[in-house]
Amino acid sequence: ACPQRPVVTFTGDAGFWYHIAEVETAVRWKINSVTVVNNNGGGNQSKRGFDRAYGGEQTAQARELWTYNPMNFARLAEDMGALGIRVETPGEFAGALARALKADRPAIIDVVTDIEAIAPAAVS
């Protein structure tokens, strides 16, 4: 509808894994998009469920079900033809977003965050 305006998406790394092939699709179709990835190396929304499955405690078995090997999504984006920007400190984010918005091509902002920073449960 408005190809000159970028679509901005925020996702976690676990969710991004489900749709990572769409970066190549966006490059091929020249879709002006910016994807901000909260890259903490795990599917933190799943943590509590896996803990419950293992008796309510964080065990090595439970942890291996929701954590991932380290990934540089910015480098992966570049390999697919998109703009990849890695952000490792909060002060880098504003510049990264400005650069991505001006790119006029698919851009992935890979924001490295702390896996131990788990949001409070929305429901109990």
Task: Name these PLM-found stretches.
Residues 1-124:
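Thiamine diphosphate
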